[in-house]
Amino acid sequence: MQVDFTIIRRGNRPLKAFVATLGFSRASYVRFFDHERNDAWLTGLREACHFFGGAPQEVLFDNASTIIRERDAYGEGDHRWHPALLALAEEFGFRPRVCRPYRAQTKGKVERFNGYLKRSFVTPLAATLKQAGLALDVSTANAHIGPWLQDIANQRSHGTTGEVPAIRLQQELPHFLPLPQALPVSPGTTATARPMPLESLQHPLSVYQDLLEVNV
């Protein structure tokens, strides 16, 4: 599994997305935050594993200081990780890995999904909200991301594999590690934002280009 934080909006109302993409199926999970501190990484990782139905054998990170404290601290390839991440890795059983410095492209699967997320979900949702005089924030984004993931993103024919991620996920699941007992709250289950039809997110993107400061 490849994980990343992608910036949706900077400034005094930041919006960021934790994104996890599986290697074989390309199934993805998203959780929005207004920061990317260590607790956000841990929450995203927990929820991603429960969303997919199991824990992957390995999780690939970038070189964020909230994840890795010192590269090669104990020898080549033997890094000093954030202790909270190590505790989570032990709880779920996965092995953390980190990209080589200045080689973030090794997380290409999740990076490509980041662009798709912004084009297909963030920008159209922000436009629909703006028409109603509302702004896209963390709680609203999390209220709508669940249905989009389940009904659109993970049900589309993937551009690389040519197959549906949700279907390929069933082939990937037998290789996952079993989940711990405790269940977290998934995005949208406690949100109070009004429901929005999924078809409202499917307009031509040219309508929305100037609505968000999006780093694609």
Positions of PLM-derived features:
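Active-site-proximal acidic segments at structured loop/helix or strand boundaries
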Residues: N114-V216
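Two-metal-ion acidic nuclease core segments, chiefly of the RNase H-like superfamily
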Residues: G77-P96
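Active-site beta-loop-alpha junctions of metal-dependent nucleic acid enzymes
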Residues: V30-E58, D78
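RNase H-like two-metal-ion nuclease catalytic core shared by retroviral integrases
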Residues: F61-D62, G75-E76, F94-R119, L136-D137, ...
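Acidic/histidine-rich, metal-coordinating catalytic segments
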Residues: G54-G77
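Short acidic, glycine/serine/threonine-rich loops at helix termini
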Residues: P14, E70-Y74, G108-R112, E163-A166, ...
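Mobile-element integrase/transposase regions
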Residues: M1-S28, E36-G44
